[in-house]
């Protein structure tokens, strides 16, 4: 009789130890990521490029047609050259169809359509995928693939 009870206890202990140590509140995590993305758009549209780039971890990789570029500096340079004139955005940015989903307790994926409109220029649009990771400082984008 003791053997089945002991076996059950060992199986339960193994199941508990195999479970994630900390359960996360995904709804709060998703809301935080969405908030950061929305604040990034607002910053871009008011001409605050550092504010727009604040979502990125300092070691982010940005995928380009020529391959990945590491760090925030190349992203900032590309945005200044292509999307800003005299410290102001050439067009207004918006995101559509934003979806955020968990990849685990400390990782998430965000996808959306980006649209640049106005400024007496033709509208441009494409899609992006942002890989997010929970850092000691909070959620940060660690990889950006935009097309």
Which residues does each predicted region cover?
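Positively charged n-region of N-terminal signal peptides that target proteins for export
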Residues: 1-4
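Surface-exposed, charged secondary-structure patches
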Residues: 77-122
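Bacterial N-terminal signal peptides
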Residues: 7-18
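Short, low-complexity N-terminal intrinsically disordered segments enriched in polar/charged residues
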Residues: 18-58, 74
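Short beta-strand edge/turn micro-motifs at domain boundaries
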Residues: 125-147
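A short gly/proline-enriched turn/hairpin at secondary-structure junctions
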Residues: 59-70, 84-89
């Amino acid at each position: 009789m003791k053997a089945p009870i002991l076996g059950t206890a060992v199986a339960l202990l193994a199941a508990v130890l195999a479970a994630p140590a900390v359960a996360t509140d995904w709804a709060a995590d998703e809301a935080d990521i969405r908030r950061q993305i929305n604040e990034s758009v607002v910053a871009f549209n008011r001409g605050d490029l550092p504010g727009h780039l604040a979502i990125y971890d300092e070691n982010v990789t940005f995928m380009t047609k020529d391959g990945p570029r590491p760090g925030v500096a190349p992203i900032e340079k590309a945005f200044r050259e292509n999307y800003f004139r005299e410290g102001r955005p050439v067009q207004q940015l918006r995101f559509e169809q934003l979806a955020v989903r968990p990849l685990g307790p400390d990782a998430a994926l965000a996808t959306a359509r980006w649209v640049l409109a106005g400024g007496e220029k033709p509208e441009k649009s494409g899609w992006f995928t942002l890989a997010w990771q929970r850092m000691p400082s909070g959620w940060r984008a660690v990889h950006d693939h935009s097309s």
